[in-house]
Each structure stands twice: as structure tokens, then as C-alpha cells.
Amino acid sequence: MASGKATGKTDAPAPIIKLGGPKPPKVGSSGNASWFQSIKAKKLNSPQPKFEGSGVPDNENIKTSQQHGYWRRQARFKPGKGGRKPVPDAWYFYYTGTGPAADLNWGDTQDGIVWVAAKGADVKSRSNQGTRDPDKFDQYPLRFSDGGPDSNFRWDFIPLHRGRSGRSTAASSAASSRAPSRDGSRGRRSGSEDDLIARAAKIIQDQQKKGSRITKAKADEMAHRRYCKRTVPPGYKVDQVFGPRTKGKEGNFGDDKMNEEGIKDGRVTAMLNLVPSSHACLFGSRVTPKLQPDGLHLRFEFTTVVPRDDPQFDNYVTICDQCVDGIGTRPKDNEPRPKSRPSSRPATRGNSPAPRQQRPKKEKKPKKQDDEVDKALTSDEERNNAQLEFDDEPKVINWGDSALGENHL
């Protein structure tokens, strides 16, 4: 039955987000959740967030005049012995006139509410952007072009591409809690320990833990498909699947460490973000067919460009330096220490070890107290204990607008 209404603004819901992921959600959902992921306090009783810049998440489909809203505190708890225990708060963004505080005007004072506005925003106006229905739409990644929240807050990594069947896996990494901005702060990078490689390794480890396990039969099938469709299963070396590494010809990527560790090497996951998809390879490559005695040979020439201002540019350059024609080498920080070898010369008075002198016995020290024992924990034990603090020392991935923007792990 045809509708009697003419086509109007109210009948054509406008998209809310344009982030290169799944199709943007529409206005008018029945849910009351924020469109965006939350920022999370690093510690209990943290002060309300302060922002470098406007504090309004990037949304290309919202006019400048509508770029205003509020961050709302959400208390969080985890189950524990004797009842639930509080954990650091989460803060969610809503546009003015939407969400749990829809009845407030911009700037109205209320506990747990922080108002933000972009330059040029009309804070007297109210938004018609609605809220998110969690049953229909995933939350969207936070991006701040003019700077993010202060160092007391962080947010989890959410890939820009994901389907409803697989909600994002929050991955951790010891990086700054601010996303790289497109201007002065864009060039800031964390130390070498917290760079792209460590983050990528953590992502794939978390996904393997939470995902379905790969059986031995499945792994064998993955490693022995048609050559162009093979993938390296967990526990396999690269040369078990794709043959020995070479120099100057096909199969020249990977050093000895990468070959031995396979996909456990975080550099593999990092570089896969630059590898073209099947469609990109087919339609974006220079394809050269050539008939040979053994069959048809297809050559695909594809170029991926990583801009020099990309936040991960230096990391990609380092990985390429290590792994292109890298057979027979290892990263400098991963070179095995040479084992000491016993001398093959016959013992003489000149090279025989002198008799050891008897050392005076040392007095036994009293046992360390509990607080002293804690100080003697190994680095691995300290790291494990830190993880038990439940987000007390969170790690964050902020990819920003990098070469990874249109890919997901």
C-alpha cells in the first residue's frame, strides 16, 4: 500500500558515522546507547576527563554547528568474593538532546556530566542524531582530530572493519592514551618496546585465546592448500608452508626469527595490514599472464604506499629492513648469545685454572618479609600481577588515521 506522505526529511534517515567500516547506522534507533566506544579511567576515583581540543569525537556527517554534546560517567563493577567490586569508571559521549541526559540543555550542571563543544558549534541547538540500538549496531571507534582525553584515561582498540558476527576484540598495548591527531601531535610515537610490533602481537594472541581453536587437521589443511591460498597456522614455521626463505627472488620476506616463530612474531601481523586483499590484488594490480610448459603463470604487481606522516611509518621501515632478504639474520635485540666452549688445548701450568681459595662463610640473612619478597618478583611475575589489577595499568592501541585505517586484523 502506497504511503500518503511525500518524501521528506523525516522519512530519509541520515547516516551518523562515516568511518570506513560497515554501513553507517541510521537515525531513529530504539536503543539508548552511545554511538561511540567509551573512554575508561585508568584508576578508581579518577577526576572527570579533560580534553586536548574540543573533546567531540570525529563525525564527518555532522555539521559544525551540531558538534557538541556531553560525556556521561558510567560506574563499572566486576564480580568477586563477597560481592561485586568497583572498577574504574567508563565515560560515554552523547550529542546534546540525546541519551540519558536528553532533557538537559548544553552547560547545565549535573554530577557525572562533562559538556564539550567544537569551535563554531551552536550549543543552543539540540541534536536529532538519536542514539544507538546495541542489538542492531556495533559501537564505533573514537577518533579525535584535535586531541583526545588526558593521560588519566584510555580507550580500547576497535577495528574499523568488522561484522555483526564478530564484535571487536579489545586489544591492549602500552601506548599513550591519546590518539594521534592530524596536526602537531600526529608525529608522537611511543618507545620501541610499545611500538607496532608489540601491539600487533598482542592483538593476534588475544584473538587466538578468545576465538575457536584450530585442530591439527585444520592446521594441516591450511598449510597444504593450493599455494596461493595457504596461510601459516599456529605452531608452523614459515618455510613449512611457503618453502625456504631466499634472497632477491620470490620468497624473500622473513628473517630467521620470523621463520621460526611464524604468526607468533608480531611483525607478521603488522605487515599483513599492508598486504592487499584478494579484490585489491586482482583489480588494483598490474596482471601479467604468461604461458609456460607447466601451465599458466600469473604475475600480480601491486604497490602499497605508506605515507611518511603515518604514525607507524618508522616501524614499517624497520620491519622491511629486517625482513626483506632477511634470511640468515635476526633483529639486533634478538640475537642469541654465543655459548661458551671448553678449550680444546691440553691443560698446562700456564692455562690450568688456579686452585680456588676458600671463602669465609657468610652469615645467613633473616627471611625476607612479605613486602620484601614482592620487591623481588621477576618482570614476568610483576606483569602477571599487574594484569590481575583489572585495568589498573591498561594498555591501549591508538592507530589513528594510519595505513591500517582501512584494514582489520
UniProtKB/Swiss-Prot annotation:
Pfam families (UniProt xref): CoV_nucleocap (PF00937)
UniProt key word Metal-binding: no
Keyword hit for Translocase: no
Stretch list, region Dimerization: 226-333
InterPro entries: N_prot_C_CoV, N_prot_N_CoV, NCAP_gCoV, Nucleocap_CoV, Nucleocapsid_C, Nucleocapsid_N
Record's compositionally biased regions (Basic and acidic residues): 180-192, 247-258, 368-384
Record's comment on post-translational modification: ADP-ribosylated. The ADP-ribosylation is retained in the virion during infection. Phosphorylated on serine and threonine residues.
Region (Disordered), start-end ranges: 1-84, 122-145, 164-194, 238-258, 327-409
Record function comment: Packages the positive strand viral genome RNA into a helical ribonucleocapsid (RNP) and plays a fundamental role during virion assembly through its interactions with the viral genome and membrane protein M. Plays an important role in enhancing the efficiency of subgenomic viral RNA transcription as well as viral replication.
HAMAP family per UniProt: GAMMA_CORONA_NCAP
Record's subunit section: Homooligomer. Both monomeric and oligomeric forms interact with RNA. Interacts with protein M. Interacts with NSP3; this interaction serves to tether the genome to the newly translated replicase-transcriptase complex at a very early stage of infection.
Protein name: Nucleoprotein
Organism name: Turkey coronavirus (strain NC95) (TCoV)
